[in-house]
């Protein structure tokens, strides 16, 4: 019971008809209670003497009579609360309780757990002295015994009234239905290679010990090849050197008193496949060769992952892989070198790897040089001619008298256009006050030390054989203020 102090004890089971004195528990140095013989002079609190049984009362199943309780005293504690049977097995039982409602004026010294066999009248303490725990496990009980249990709270003034279980506790074999717990890695096909060992450990549950049996594909196991060892909680199947004949479904059956549980495990023993049965060079054209082959007769007891195709030049004899894990049985090998002769071979592949041998073409693939005639195309010269168009127009500008200023624009044309600058529609070329520059399509007009007289509308015109274009802007030269 979680959160409670616990104690364990072992109880001897003397025969009631024997003349020996009754056995009572004693405390070992370890703190646990072991069985030992008592002469009735133990220092533990004396059990209450039962009253004589009524002859008319049942002899076997009646609860043993207890002494008539004395009126409760304020010095002794009251009876413990909620005495509960927690667990029973074939050789032990566990009980728990809660502290009494009243501990008495002198305080609590501990609890005394007592048992009385069904049909007997003597209450025997489990511990030689009171223990400060609220849960105890009594061990070493005989199968088939029935006990009444009670617990008493004890103080220095004496023992209080007991708390008693209403029904006797029957010590009996616990039956647990069989159940097999297959490990996760065995829930899918278990694959091993030929020659490897197979060692399967399958846990199971069931009480008492169940009967275990194995079958292979519905038949009994071959004891010369397969070894089985079963314990109380698991069964081990072992094959020292697995062969392909060991593949199949192994079924584990656990029987217990008319109940059974079954689990199946699929084992697949594989090996490398054989090579393809045949290979044929179908055709050779240009720098290409077409191949075809047939699947192997032996796949290694498992599915093929594909084929590996290799080529080798006759001059070097070195093999190079062209295709890996290729599933079809026909392929075309491209990018072969002109003038070389090639051989081809194909391997089969499964989970164990490539086949030890490969199937090779008998004939060579000769890559011949073909006659090539060059037919040059007629050169068509592109016409880049274009009428003038301004890609960047002139922008209006404001200048200060006495400081040179510049106007910019850019033009696109082919052939190169003629650039003409004008002021107020009048050509200003040749005027030393202006300097015009045109380079890489960028047109610049510099006005040296302008005055208010130079204000006006400036125009840049571009002319070639395909047309002309022009852009305008306004220049304003502000006179300086006079004082």
Swiss-Prot record:
Regarding tissue, the record states:
Skeletal muscle. Expressed at low levels in heart ventricles.
Keyword tags: Cell adhesion, Immunoglobulin domain, Muscle protein, Phosphoprotein, Repeat, Thick filament
Q: Which ranges are annotated Low complexity under compositional bias?
A: 41-66
Q: Could you state one GO cellular component term attached to this entry?
A: myosin filament
Question: Which CDD domains does UniProt cross-reference here?
Answer: FN3
Q: Which GO terms describe its biological process?
A: cell adhesion
Superkingdom, taxonomy of origin:
Eukaryota
Phosphothreonine-modified residues are 2, 6, 26
Chain ranges of the Fibronectin type-III domain: 79-174, 275-370
Renumbered to this chain, region (Disordered) spans 1-78
| Role | Binds to myosin; probably involved in interaction with thick myofilaments in the A-band.
Family the UniProt entry places it in? Belongs to the immunoglobulin superfamily. MyBP family.
Q: What is the protein name given in its UniProt record?
A: Myosin-binding protein H
Upper lineage ranks?
A: Eukaryota, Metazoa, Chordata, Craniata, Vertebrata
């Amino acid at each position: 019971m979680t959160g409670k102090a616990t104690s364990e004890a072992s109880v001897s089971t003397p025969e009631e008809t024997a003349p020996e004195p009754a056995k009572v528990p004693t405390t070992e140095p370890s703190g646990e209670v072991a069985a030992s013989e008592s002469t009735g002079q133990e220092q533990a609190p004396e059990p209450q003497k039962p009253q004589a049984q009524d002859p008319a009362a049942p002899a076997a199943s009646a609860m043993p009579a207890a002494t008539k309780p004395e009126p409760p005293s304020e010095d002794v504690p009251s009876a413990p609360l909620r005495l509960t049977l927690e667990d029973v097995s074939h050789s032990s039982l566990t009980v728990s309780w809660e502290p009494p409602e009243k501990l008495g004026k002198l305080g609590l010294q501990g609890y005394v757990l007592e048992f009385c066999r069904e049909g007997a009248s003597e209450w025997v303490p489990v511990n030689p002295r009171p223990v400060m725990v609220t849960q105890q496990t009594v061990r070493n009980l005989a199968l088939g015994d029935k006990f009444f249990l009670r617990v008493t709270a004890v103080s220095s003034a004496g023992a209080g009234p007991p708390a008693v279980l209403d029904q006797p506790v029957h010590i009996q074999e616990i039956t647990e239905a069989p159940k097999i717990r297959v490990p996760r890695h065995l829930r899918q096909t278990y694959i091993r290679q030929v020659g490897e060992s197979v060692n399967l450990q399958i846990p199971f549950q069931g009480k008492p010990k169940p009967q275990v049996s194995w079958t292979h594909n519905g038949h009994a196991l071959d004891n010369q090849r397969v070894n089985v060892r079963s314990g109380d909680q698991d069964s081990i199947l072992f094959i020292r050197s697995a062969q392909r004949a060991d593949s199949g479904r192994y079924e584990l059956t656990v029987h217990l008193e008319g109940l059974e549980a079954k689990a199946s495990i699929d084992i697949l023993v594989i090996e490398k496949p054989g090579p393809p049965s045949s290979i044929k060079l179908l055709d050779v054209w240009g720098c290409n060769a077409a191949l075809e082959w047939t699947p192997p007769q032996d796949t290694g007891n498992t599915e093929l992952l594909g084929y590996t195709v290799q080529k080798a030049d006759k001059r070097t004899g070195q093999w190079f892989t062209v295709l890996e894990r290729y599933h079809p049985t026909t392929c075309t090998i491209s990018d072969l070198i002109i003038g070389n002769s090639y051989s081809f071979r194909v391997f089969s592949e499964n989970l164990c790897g490539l086949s030890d041998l490969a199937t090779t073409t008998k004939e060579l693939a000769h890559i011949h040089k073909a006659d090539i005639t060059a037919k040059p195309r007629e050169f068509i010269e592109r016409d880049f001619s274009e009428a003038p168009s301004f890609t960047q127009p002139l922008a209006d500008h404001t200048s200060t008298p006495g400081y040179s200023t510049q106007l910019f624009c850019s033009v696109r044309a082919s052939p190169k256009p003629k650039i003409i600058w004008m002021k107020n529609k009048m050509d200003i070329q040749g005027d030393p006050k202006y300097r015009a520059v045109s380079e890489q399509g960028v047109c610049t007009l510099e006005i040296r030390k302008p005055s208010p007289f130079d204000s006006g509308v400036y125009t840049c015109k571009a002319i070639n054989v395909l047309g002309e274009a022009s852009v305008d802007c306004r220049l304003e030269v502000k006179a300086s203020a006079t004082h």
